[in-house]
Curated annotation (Swiss-Prot):
<dbReference type="GO" id="GO:0005886">
    <property type="term" value="C:plasma membrane"/>
</dbReference>
<dbReference type="GO" id="GO:0005905">
    <property type="term" value="C:clathrin-coated pit"/>
</dbReference>
<keyword id="KW-0653">Protein transport</keyword>
<dbReference type="InterPro" id="IPR013041">
    <property type="entry name" value="Clathrin_app_Ig-like_sf"/>
</dbReference>
<dbReference type="GO" id="GO:0072583">
    <property type="term" value="P:clathrin-dependent endocytosis"/>
</dbReference>
<dbReference type="InterPro" id="IPR008152">
    <property type="entry name" value="Clathrin_a/b/g-adaptin_app_Ig"/>
</dbReference>
<feature type="compositionally biased region" description="Polar residues">
    <location>
        <begin position="636"/>
        <end position="645"/>
    </location>
</feature>
<dbReference type="InterPro" id="IPR003164">
    <property type="entry name" value="Clathrin_a-adaptin_app_sub_C"/>
</dbReference>
<dbReference type="GO" id="GO:0030122">
    <property type="term" value="C:AP-2 adaptor complex"/>
</dbReference>
<keyword id="KW-1003">Cell membrane</keyword>
<dbReference type="GO" id="GO:0035615">
    <property type="term" value="F:clathrin adaptor activity"/>
</dbReference>
<dbReference type="InterPro" id="IPR016024">
    <property type="entry name" value="ARM-type_fold"/>
</dbReference>
<dbReference type="Pfam" id="PF01602">
    <property type="entry name" value="Adaptin_N"/>
</dbReference>
<keyword id="KW-0813">Transport</keyword>
<feature type="region of interest" description="Disordered">
    <location>
        <begin position="623"/>
        <end position="670"/>
    </location>
</feature>
<dbReference type="InterPro" id="IPR009028">
    <property type="entry name" value="Coatomer/calthrin_app_sub_C"/>
</dbReference>
<comment type="similarity">
    <text>Belongs to the adapter complexes large subunit family.</text>
</comment>
Length: 934
């Protein structure tokens, strides 16, 4: 059968039909391979192929590529099609080049030459195909190769309009890739004057190009302002003298009008020329007037085009912010849209009014719509519109309406969508502080926030209320009374407990005179919440209790009993254990004067910009008004690590060292040892009061997932560790605590790590004093450098002698497993599974199926994997129960990429763990570290 000539390629149609009729993936691949073999034989055959046949086979290759198969031949045949004079053949050649050829191809020079030939052609269709190909590829090489030809085509008087339009868009694409492609000087004026072109396509494309050029070099292209205003005036004035043929549903050239209005927003003000400014204001007034006219058509296209121009004009009015009458008119027009039936229109009106509210000229006009905006916040069905209403209320708030707006936002917060609650909390907190004339009102607002939306109250918010109360003496008593009453609620949020604990610890004495809030009542109220709180809050409450001992000596015994409780002194949380032991010892050995000095009230905080405002700016950059700044105290945040460790105590207790654990570890400035008999004797006789036992606790295995805590403990010695890792470097602080009543002599910790292993993991250890006094604690510093991948971990052998006893030796594995040098790596599903497939070799993967050691705890497993050092990737695996992670192990020699997949089976109570990495030894080691941890 003779081949069909023309655009209808029968062979291509038959091939596509065959592919669609394939019943399986294997059948499809078989048919594709057969076709590839046929095409390859045709290209290599002795018979010369004509243009039609080349086009047909190149189309088939293109279709196969689009099915997801790699194509490694046919490129030369596609390049040959570029020299054809037939449009259909040249078009297919350019299509193949645009899709399959990359800039590193050996054929790129030949392709560039073919494109240059077409750019010089007198056939505008060929020129357009070449320009479209350049724009589609848009590479640096293309920009450099055609940096002279395309600008010439754009400004040449001989160039056809359709080619000029393509040249402008092509130049815009290349400018985004290579901003230096467009020459300056005389070219600037010639490009700007394209705004006067009579062809709609040319002037629209040129406006987009000029807008991009202005953003890079506004001064050089400032001449475009007068031309843009003039062109806009000719379009929107009543006579419609310009572009009459381009009216879209009774709106003249709406797309060009929008582009011109956006172009003018690059300058502020657009012009100093009073004539041009007057003409621009006339245009803007005309657009606002037309918005008031009855619609000329009921079709949605008319209203969409009309409103698009209107909103862009309003954006320009807001940007200029210099014409009060225009700003007020714009505000009134937007106010009409607030009750429009179109949801999108209401959203855009609220968004634009947010900007108008920040202008001194239109702020009062915006406030007139307050009731409608409040109604929108409460009644709108679309959450995004409600969000915009909240934003507008925040923007229009000032001293005159702050209390009303804050109260309305608090009322709405109880039923607000979860997605906007956190942001609303921040905004209410900022408004309450910024416009508070009475700080008792501010305290009430923040406590209400915590009561209504405690889960969404960030640390910055409750830190801030504490700082405000500390800095303002007149509100301290009220705050103590109010928070005491709030804590009496049956269901009390943990953030309320934090605020209450802190404020009562500082100012509880101000309300202690009332029998209803006597010292013991305050203490029992707080302690009733203790066991319901997290470790961080418990630590804060312990600090409050030691403050109570200073404020209310009469309840000292009750509080000391709490410190002595087994759950505190023997807490699994090292911070709670340390605080309980230190605070108990402090309350026992310190005199009243020393206690008062150590636990005196927190001083006032110096001021800085609000951290709450900074959080809000981070959440919605560009949406927080510039005049929203409030001043804030610059202070250590009152968190559980330092809130009650005030002044002298920060110098006199080792808990204060804990408050700056990172700086101590990095600065290597921790004192070598504490001296028995002083306030920093953190162990003292405490352990004699606890229930002694002879159990040995070795937590080395748990440190696969954590960096800080108690590493080892027996009746004689406690070893704690704090560590930090960055890429292939690590630093550890080991803390040795003597639990006995006598000194430990000949105390020598020795690193146990072979010379061969030291070539892969270099560990340096600093010596310590040979005597560890009774009840004392000393620190030893280690540094580690991962040079190459290694197995296992070094250990430390501690030898010592107890006075009058036999020599002792303790061996503990150090938390220096290979996973400590992980860097978490973010990636999307496509990247993850592509990498997963690439690491599918037998030597690159390890898989274990094992029984869970305890009932399946998926949140716990996720926490463990996060602590392991890899990045836990959400929404990657189709099964939501499965966990996938990615990370890079840093060594001096190389980086090792690792992927992990953990698949739980709830019915069988089993896990399947799969590890893939580029090194077999690392794969096996990671698998071995994890397999017995779940």
């Amino acid at each position: 059968m003779a081949p069909v000539r023309g655009d209808g390629m029968r062979g291509l149609a038959v091939f596509i039909s065959d592919i669609r009729n394939c019943k399986s993936k294997e059948a499809e691949i078989k048919r594709i391979n057969k076709e590839l073999a046929n095409i390859r034989s045709k290209f290599k055959g002795d018979k010369t192929l004509d243009g039609y046949q080349k086009k047909k086979y190149v189309c088939k290759l293109l279709f196969i590529f689009l099915l997801g198969h790699d194509i490694d031949f046919g490129h030369m045949e596609a390049v040959n099609l570029l020299s054809s004079n037939k449009y259909s053949e040249k078009q297919i050649g350019y299509l193949f080049i645009s899709v399959l050829v990359n800039t590193n191809s050996d054929l790129i020079k030949l392709i560039i030459q073919s494109i240059k030939n077409d750019l010089q052609s007198r056939n505008p269709i060929h020129v357009n195909l070449a320009l479209q190909c350049i724009a589609n590829i848009g590479s640096q090489d293309m920009a450099e190769a055609f940096s002279n030809e395309i600008p010439k085509l754009l400004v040449s008087g001989d160039t056809m309009d359709v080619v000029k339009q393509s040249a402008a868009l092509c130049l815009l694409r290349l400018f985004r890739t290579c901003p230096d492609i467009i020459p300056g000087g005389e070219w600037t004026s010639r490009i700007i004057h394209l705004l006067n072109d009579q062809h709609m396509g040319v002037v629209t494309a040129a406006t987009s190009l000029i807008d991009a050029l202005v953003k890079k070099n506004p001064e050089e292209y400032k001449g475009c302002v007068s031309l843009a205003v003039s062109r806009l005036s000719r379009i929107v004035t009543a006579s419609y003298t310009d572009l009459q043929d381009y009216t879209y549903y009774f709106v003249p050239a709406p797309w060009l009008s929008v582009k011109l209005l956006r172009l003018l927003q690059n300058y502020n003000p657009p012009t100093e020329d009073p004539g041009v400014r007057g003409r621009l204001n006339e245009c803007l007034e005309t657009i606002l007037n037309k918005a008031q006219e009855p619609p000329k058509s009921k079709k949605v296209q008319h209203s969409n085009a009309k409103n698009a121009v209107l909103f862009e004009a309003i954006n320009l009015i807001i940007h200029n912010d210099s014409e009060p009458s225009l700003l007020v008119r714009a505000c009134n027009q937007l106010g009409q849209f607030l009750s429009n039936r179109e949801t999108n229109l209401r959203y855009l009106a609220l968004e634009s009014m947010c900007h108008l509210a920040t202008s001194e000229f239109s702020h009062e006009a915006v406030k007139k719509h307050q009731e409608v905006v409040i109604l929108s916040m409460k009644m709108e069905k679309d959450v995004s519109v409600r969000q915009q209403a909240v934003d507008l209320l925040y923007a229009m708030c000032d001293r005159s309406n702050a209390e009303e707006i804050v109260q309305e936002m608090l009322n709405y917060l109880e039923t607000a969508d979860y997605s906007i609650r956190e942001e609303m909390v921040l905004k209410v907190a900022i408004l309450a502080e910024k416009y508070a004339t009475d700080y008792t009102w501010y305290v009430d607002v923040i406590l209400n926030l915590i009561r209504i939306a405690g889960d969404y109250v960030s640390e910055e918010v409750w830190y801030r209320v504490i700082q405000i109360v500390i800095n303002r003496e007149e509100v301290q008593g009220y705050a103590a009374k109010t928070v005491f009453e709030a804590l009496q609620a049956p269901a009390c949020h943990e953030n309320m407990v934090k605020v209450g604990g802190y404020i009562l610890g500082e100012f509880g004495n101000l309300i202690a005179g009332d029998s209803r809030s006597a010292p013991m009542v305050q203490f029992k109220l707080l302690h009733s919440k203790y066991h319901l709180c997290s470790s961080m809050t418990r630590a804060l409450l312990l600090s409050t209790y030691i403050k109570f001992i200073n404020l209310f000596p009469e309840i000292r015994g009750t509080i000391q009993d709490v410190f002595r409780q087994h759950s505190n002194l023997r807490s699994a949380d090292a911070e709670l254990q340390q605080r309980a032991s230190e605070y108990l010892q402090l309350s026992i050995v310190a005199s009243t004067d020393v206690l008062a000095t150590v636990l005196e009230e927190m001083p006032s905080f110096p001021e800085r910009e609000s951290s709450i405002l900074a959080v809000l700016k981070k959440k919605k950059p560009g949406r927080v008004p510039e005049n929203a700044e409030i001043r804030e105290t610059k202070s250590p945040v009152p968190n559980s690590h330092n809130n009650a460790h005030s002044n002298a105590q920060t110098n006199h207790t080792s808990s204060a060292n804990n408050a700056n654990a990172s700086s101590d570890l990095l600065g290597l400035s921790t004192p070598p040892a504490s001296q028995s008999g002083t306030l920093i004797d953190v162990l003292g006789d405490i352990y004699s009061t606890a229930n002694g036992n002879s159990n040995v606790v070795n937590n080395s295995k748990k440190f696969v997932f954590k960096n800080n805590g108690v590493l080892f403990e027996n009746d004689l010695l406690q070893i704690g560790v704090k560590s930090e890792f960055r890429q292939n470097l690590g630093r550890l602080g080991l803390y040795y605590g003597n639990k006995t009543q006598t000194a430990l002599q000949n105390f020598v910790p020795t690193l146990q790590w072979s010379a061969e292993d030291a070539l892969k993991l270099n560990v340096q250890i600093k010596a310590v004093e040979p005597t560890l006094e009774a009840g004392a604690q000393i620190q030893q510093l280690l540094t580690a450098e991962c040079i190459d991948h290694y197995l296992g971990a070094p250990s430390i052998v501690i030898s010592f002698r107890v006075s009058g006893g036999a020599p002792q030796k303790i061996t503990v594995n150090l938390p220096l497993t290979i996973n400590k040098f992980f860097e978490p790596t973010e990636m999307n599903a496509e990247s993850f599974f592509a990498r997963w497939r690439n690491l599918g070799g037998e030597q690159q993967r390890a898989q274990r199926v094992f029984k869970a050691q305890q009932p399946l705890d998926l949140p716990g497993a996720r926490n463990k994997l996060t602590g392991f050092g890899m990045q836990l990737l959400d929404s990657i695996d189709p099964n939501p129960d499965n966990m996938v992670c990615a990370g890079i192990i840093h060594t001096q020699a190389h980086k090792v990429g690792c992927l992990l997949r953990l698949e739980p089976n709830k019915q069988a109570q089993m896990f399947r763990l799969t590890i893939r990495s580029s090194l077999e030894a690392v794969t096996q080691e990671i698998c071995d570290l994890l397999v017995d941890q779940f």
